[in-house]
């Protein structure tokens, strides 16, 4: 199969959080989503439905120490169509899966002269189990159960400070980080249903990856409601290569308290985002849209968020 040609995503999230006390916030989010990916030139596709439940929290251990965490579970169902040569040779299948995921982040702030120095650490992990399934078709393939383990850790430091100007404030920042992506033992094992003696296997991500990240940026905030931001980040994957990312953003809050924002972000392909946000009768409405520029395969999306405090 060749690379993905088209992807359509649709999701609805419903959540709520509560401030338990001055130092703790807890929340829950339920998300139902669909991800439809067309693959290759013959019409192969993977249509996945997922339902996820996440619990999250944010804790202030004291005035300068913070702990954020999230844990969640997902149920997955995929309708798979594999085509080898146009519409004349089609295999179909249905695969179920389960996933558990979590993230833990710790940070501590230190003040030095006019700067804030924040050491931080993070750990992200997930375990996914995909059930075995057998295709239906003339060249059907049987796929064994598959377990996918993902684990990534990082340690870093953020340095930031404010510069006060007439009618405005400039906040600059520098970010340094070391991360490690641990290799997964996940293996895909298959065989053709017409040949029960020969099996095929494939294993990706066989080695650990060390990742170095450095970035800097600033925010310019004017009292008239204008905010301009810029960030540059370079990520070096040892023995593999590097990724450069640039983010430019601008927003303005009008006299009617409507916020308009535009972003430009990307590496080789830049994505443009346009957002509008407004509070109406205690409800925060946000409309988000994005479009990828200079890409052979255009990507575009839209999002509507509604939130309120009770």
Regions found by a protein language model. Name each.
Residues 1-310:
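Membrane translocator/pore-forming domains, dominated by Gram-negative outer-membrane beta-barrels
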């Amino acid at each position: 199969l060749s690379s993905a040609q088209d992807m359509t995503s649709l999701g609805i999230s419903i959540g709520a959080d509560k401030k338990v006390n001055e130092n703790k916030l807890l929340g829950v989010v339920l998300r139902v989503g669909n991800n439809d990916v067309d693959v290759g030139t013959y019409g192969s596709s993977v249509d996945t439905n997922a339902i996820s439940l996440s619990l999250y929290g944010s804790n202030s251990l004291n005035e300068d120490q913070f702990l954020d965490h999230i844990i969640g579970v997902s149920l997955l169902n995929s309708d798979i169509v594999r085509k080898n040569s146009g519409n004349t040779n089609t295999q179909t299948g249905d695969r179920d899966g389960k996933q558990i995921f979590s993230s833990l982040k710790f940070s501590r702030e230190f003040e030095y002269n006019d700067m804030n120095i924040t050491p931080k650490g993070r750990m992200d992990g997930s375990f996914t189990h995909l059930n075995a399934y057998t295709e239906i078709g003339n060249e059907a393939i049987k796929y064994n159960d598959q377990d996918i383990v993902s684990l990534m850790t990082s340690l870093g430091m953020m340095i930031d400070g404010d510069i006060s100007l007439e009618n405005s404030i400039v906040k600059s920042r520098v970010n340094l980080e070391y991360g490690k992506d641990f290799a997964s033992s996940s293996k895909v094992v298959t065989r053709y249903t017409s040949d029960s003696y020969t099996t095929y296997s494939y294993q990706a991500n066989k080695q650990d990856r060390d990742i170095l990240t450095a970035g800097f940026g600033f925010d310019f905030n004017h009292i008239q409601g204008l905010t301009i931001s810029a960030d540059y980040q370079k990520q070096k994957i040892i023995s593999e290569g590097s990724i450069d990312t640039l983010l430019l953003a601008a927003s303005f809050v009008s006299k009617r308290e409507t916020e308009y924002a535009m972003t430009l972000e990307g590496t080789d392909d830049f994505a443009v985002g346009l957002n509008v946000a407004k509070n109406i009768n205690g409800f925060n409405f946000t409309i988000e849209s994005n479009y990828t520029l200079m890409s052979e395969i255009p990507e575009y999306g839209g999002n509507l968020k509604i939130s309120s405090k009770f």
